[in-house]
Amino acid sequence: MNSALPEDVKNLLTELETFLLDVLKAETLSKKGKEKKEILIKRLKDIKHSYPQEFQDKAEDDDQEENDGFPLPPDAVSLASDRDKDEDLPYDGSFYPPVAAQDLEYLKAGYLEKRRKDHSFFASEWQKRWCVFTNSLFYYYGSDKDKQQKGAFSLDGYRAKMNDTLRKDAKKDCCFEIFAPDKRVYQFAASSPKEAEEWINAIMNSRGIIATEDEELYDDVNQEIDASLEEDIYEELPEESEKPVTETETQKATPVPVNNTSGKENTDYANFYRGLWDCTGDHPDELSFKHGDTIYIISKEYNTYGWWVGEMKGTIGLVPKAYIIEMYDI
């Protein structure tokens, strides 16, 4: 009679099996590596055959954990049993009947990497999913040919925004999340930052939401300024490089009255700032200045991230807005 396996040993064997069958499936192995993989899989099968009751109980426990806490309708049992172990029911316990991916009338669909809510040491944290959203629901499938979804949730109350803290690899700037107060956050990675922005736009537009400054599409100001923008800035520099400095000196002597409403002059004065503290740029595209220096603000395009584009003494660069203050009280 076989003795019982310790729980931690069973868990380790289960994770090892997941690693061999799922994680290594997408890897290119050498001939020797493939042979070793097959040997380990065979040994795992032999162990499971030697302890059938142990692993049968484990499978039943997993199914029970998947359904705990949510009352499922009788016809939902088969659907729940077919879900991946990493997939879960909607936060609010709602049940969405199975629907084939190709039967949906959608606003946007495509392959994304979905971050698993829970993942083991060996199992991949991100899984490729065919994602589809309609006017009110977001579905995700194993592929675009699947007859039923892996999961679904209502978009009611949800918003979408970029999140560059989810990964540290090449897809760091391709990640976004769908979130709502007191609800589960769903996190995804697209194939490119542009595709992620398209998903965010589509989701926000479908909800009739206008993005606030905090939810505007991500544009990393630490990266180099877009080539076309940079060219536009420096093309104007020869004509205007000395002008802001001259105007600044004049304004120091004769500040504009608060009630001045003279169109362009008023606008120009409003764009003059002075340094609150010394600031040394960490990157070539950042402007360095000292306390009291006069800076002319050209653009507030990166306001969301706390940066503006400024010009000082013929040099143009990014300026942290927290380090400057308006020169005149307009």
Curated annotation (Swiss-Prot):
Entry-linked SUPFAM superfamilies: PH domain-like, SH3-domain
Swiss-Prot/TrEMBL keywords: B-cell activation, Cytoplasm, Phosphoprotein, SH3 domain
GO cellular component: cytoplasm; plasma membrane
Biased composition regions of type Basic and acidic residues, renumbered to the chain: 240-250
Comp. bias (Polar residues): 251-261
Disulfide cross-links: none
Spans annotated as Disordered: 57-84, 236-261
Domain PH: 105-208
Keyword Nucleus: no
Record-annotated SH3 domain positions: 268-329
One GO-annotated biological process of the protein: B cell activation
Organism superkingdom: Eukaryota
Sequence ranges of Acidic residues compositional bias: 59-68
Signal peptide residues on this chain, from the entry's feature table: none
One Pfam match: PH
Subcellular location(s) of the protein: Cytoplasm
PTM characteristics: Phosphorylated on tyrosines.
Family stated for the protein in its record: Belongs to the SKAP family.
Annotated function: May be involved in B-cell and macrophage adhesion processes. May play a role in src signaling pathway.
Name of the protein in its database record: Src kinase-associated phosphoprotein 2-B
Organism, scientific name: Xenopus laevis
Phylogenetic lineage: Eukaryota, Metazoa, Chordata, Craniata, Vertebrata
